[in-house]
């Protein structure tokens, strides 16, 4: 499941191209369906992806870096999906409130409030799964392995493997989703709504 040097060299450009195409399609679809909030959500999504890659690559010295495996890439993709989902929920709630006749400011307030609970529920569930995976398949002296020792002791020592990379990238991406998909998106939307010339494209 580890990407070999030859495979990595040959497929890197293809992976980057596929990622850019997928992102362009997401931007087009989100903008078409949700207009300005959808476009702003895609900016936050790009920040989430960049921050996730920075954490994985060891750009921040306090966090460990590791070789990116196929399960690790899968974790990043799933976290991106969670980010898109969070932004869709928020944008859809705002759209519903506007269709019900509320003012823009009222729709934003109600939409943010209605969208927060399902976003938190979904992300907390994924965080729990990621922590369990990191505890079960990470180093035996790792933080989560020690914290969950009372759960895993009956199954023998934890087994280090590539699933740990999946859990790590998934946990990192979902936590960053709270920062970018919830907080940053809402700050940008509120900021755009305060600009008179941008109050129409909603």
Name each region found by the language model:
Residues 14, 18, 22, 26, ...:
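Small-residue faces within membrane-embedded alpha-helices
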Residues 39-61, 73-80, 147-179:
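Small-residue-enriched core segments of transmembrane alpha-helices in multipass membrane transport
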Residues 58-73, 90-98, 188:
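A cytosolic-side transmembrane-helix exit/cap motif
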Residues 7, 26, 55, 88, ...:
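Residue-level signature of catalytic and energy-coupling elements of molecular machines
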Residues 96-202:
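Hydrophobic alpha-helical transmembrane segments of membrane transport and translocation systems
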């Amino acid at each position: 499941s580890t990407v070999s040097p030859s495979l990595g060299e040959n497929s890197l450009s293809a992976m980057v191209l596929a990622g850019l195409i997928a992102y362009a399609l997401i931007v087009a679809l989100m903008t078409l369906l949700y207009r300005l909030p959808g476009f702003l959500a895609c900016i936050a999504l790009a920040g989430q992806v960049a921050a996730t890659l920075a954490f994985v690559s060891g750009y921040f010295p306090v966090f460990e870096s590791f070789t990116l495996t196929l399960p690790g890439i899968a974790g990043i993709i799933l976290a991106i999906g969670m980010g898109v989902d969070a932004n869709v929920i928020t944008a859809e709630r705002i759209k519903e409130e506007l269709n019900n006749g509320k003012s823009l400011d009222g729709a934003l307030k109600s939409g943010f409030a209605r969208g927060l609970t399902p976003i938190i529920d979904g992300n907390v569930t994924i965080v729990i799964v990621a922590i369990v995976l990191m505890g079960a398949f990470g180093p035996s002296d790792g933080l989560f392995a020690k914290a969950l020792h009372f759960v895993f002791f009956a199954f023998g020592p934890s087994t280090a493997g590539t699933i740990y990379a999946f859990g790590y990238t998934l946990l990192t991406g979902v936590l960053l989703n709270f920062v970018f998909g919830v907080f940053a998106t809402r700050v940008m939307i509120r900021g755009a709504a305060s600009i008179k010339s941008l109050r129409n494209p909603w």
